[in-house]
Each structure stands twice: as C-alpha cells, then as structure tokens.
Amino acid sequence: MGTLATRAACHGAHLALALLLLLSLSGPWLSAVVPGTPPLFNVSLDAAPEQRWLPMLRHYDPDFLRTAVAQVIGDRVPQWVLGMVGEIVSKVESFLPQPFTDEIRSICDSLNLSLADGILVNLAYEASAFCTSIVAQDSQGHIYHGRNLDYPFGKILRKLTANVQFIKNGQIAFTGTTFVGYVGLWTGQSPHKFTISGDERDKGWWWENMIAALSLGHSPISWLIRKTLSESESFEAAVYTLAKTPLIADVYYIVGGTSPKEGVVITRDRGGPADIWPLDPLNGEWFRVETNYDHWKPAPKVDDRRTPAIKALNATGQAHLNLETLFQVLSLFPVYNNYTIYTTVMSAAEPDKYLTMIRNPS
C-alpha cells in the first residue's frame, strides 16, 4: 500500500507522464483534441459505507447529477423494467452485496433520488461498456496494462469521470477510475500486486439475465473488480476470484501482474470461465488484445478494433513497449474513437504511474 504522504510525489509523476504522452501524440496516432486528466478523490473504506462517497459528491452540482442519472436510465433501461422498477428493487435489494447497496442508498439520499434509480443506474452502466484492453510484457519482463473505455453519453460521462484512491488504515489500498455516483470499477490497480480492466461480453437479453442472476446472489461485473482489488493479495488470487465468482452477466476480465508472464484475458460466462488466455512471451506472444469479442473468433468487420491494435503493437515492438507507447497504441483509430470516454495506462509494479486521461473533451 502507498501512504498518503507520497500523494504529492505521485501527482508529480502523473503530470510528468501526461506531458510525455502529449508530446508523443503526433503523426498518425491521434487527431483528437488534447486530453485532460480527471479529478482525484479519496474514498475512505475506514468510514461507514453511508459516508464514503459524500465528500466526493460535494464537488458536483446535484442538479447535473440528477440529470445524468435520468438520461442514463431513460436510454439504457428498457421500458418494461422501468414499469416494474419498484417491484424489481424490492426483490433484488436483499441479494445485492454489501457494502455496495448501502453506498448507493447514501448517494441516493444525498441527491434526493430513489434507491431504485440508484441501483438501476449502477446496473445500467454494466450493460454497454464497449472497450479495448491490452496487457503486454516488454523485453525486460515488465508488465503493462492499458484500456480505452467507450460509452455513450460522452458529454455527460466525461464530466463525471474521476480517479479514486480507496483508503484503508490510512494507506492507499487500491486505485480506480469510475463515474461519480457509480460504486463499481471497470479499471483499477492494487499497488505492487495486479491491475484489472473489464470489457463487456454481449450475449443478449441482458436485463432478463441480470434480474434472474441477482436473485441468485450473483455479483455485478464492476463490483467484483472492486472487491478483488480490495481483498486479493496476489495476481494468482485475483485471477482465481475473477474466474470463479458467479456474475450477473458475461464479461472479459483482463489482469496484469508484476512478474514476467503475469498477464491474462479471462473470458467469463455467468457461471464461470469460458476461456483463460495467458501471455506466452517465450513463444512470441508478449501481448493480449481484448475488445468485446471472443478472441478465438474473427472480429466483426463493422467493429474491428482488434486488428489495428495488434498491428500497432507489432510495429512498436516488445523492446520499445512502455506506458507512453502503449498509450499511443490506444490512441490509434478505431481503437480510439468518438465513443472513447477515457484511456488508462498502468503498471502494478510502478503504481505511482497510474494515469487516466479523458478523451474527446468538449
């Protein structure tokens, strides 16, 4: 864990890396507006769940947050779900893992929202997280992990993107990137242990499956990422938890460690792993690219982000891989596109270099 006394030094490292990234984004890699870094907040896990997110919420206009919730729910949640929302929440609330439900209830109370709306907006984000994730090993055995998170509602979500340091016993237990009001994580790092990102695996009939799975006590996708970051003590333990824990929907979990060969893509069914795809650098397979499609199947021509990413990594070369060049790969169209909300690059062995940059800012 990192002490809070190092926060200023870490912030300086973030700025230095950000400057290098901005200087490197020239030529064919990117034609976008210069990205920006999101705000950084602390969330104390030593505080009661009802108190954890309140300091962060005070930095945002409640009316804007309520508008964001209404827009996401109105667009992502089917009408048949909205029509029976009260009944649904009353049925699944007792099955939702803690402390997440109490945290959501507190956020709702602060914003004068119903618990039903709070739970729905947290679950709605789980339905459409289109992404590109890369885990790779350089020629010296260092592991790097990067991801783009693509999502609708860019004008709103870019304003709600934040980095969060989760504090336990006065130390940084883990770090993640999330949206204000969303208690899960799609991107995170446990310092000196492992990194995780999640990519949606769309199998259809999502809401029906979700409601059925919640009633069985299965975990939401992003909540398991946060739980794993909080509780797992090693790369191996994280992979086991992410592979075996029952989920409300299918997903791809991408995990990076701190030692050579510690990188893997876990293709998940709701009940368990469908496939485990580790790095194999001794046989020249020093990176893994995961978008939103099973890696053993061709990527659809209408959404092939995989092939450009692979070509860019091969052009970069293992000897030249680092966080800056990985960011460049994630800045190549269509890996980077109009729906990209943020890009994160990270390495668990160097946790102070965790960096998220907001893309396509207005």
From Swiss-Prot:
It is found in: Lysosome; Membrane. GO terms for cellular component: cytoplasm; lysosome; membrane. It comes from the Eukaryota. It catalyses: N-hexadecanoylethanolamine + H2O = ethanolamine + hexadecanoate; an N-(long-chain fatty acyl)ethanolamine + H2O = a long-chain fatty acid + ethanolamine; N-dodecanoylethanolamine + H2O = dodecanoate + ethanolamine; N-tetradecanoylethanolamine + H2O = tetradecanoate + ethanolamine. One of its GO terms (molecular function) is DNA-binding transcription factor binding. The record marks 147, 292 as: Important for enzyme activity. Residues 1-33 form the signal peptide. Its EC number is 3.5.1.60, 3.5.1.23. The keyword Membrane applies. It is an enzyme of class 3 (hydrolase). Glycans are attached at residues 42, 112, 314, 338. InterPro entries: Acid_ceramidase-like, Acid_ceramidase_N, CBAH/NAAA_C. Degrades bioactive fatty acid amides to their corresponding acids, with the following preference: N-palmitoylethanolamine > N-myristoylethanolamine > N-stearoylethanolamine > N-oleoylethanolamine > N-linoleoylethanolamine > N-arachidonoylethanolamine. Belongs to the acid ceramidase family. This is N-acylethanolamine-hydrolyzing acid amidase. It comes from Mus musculus.
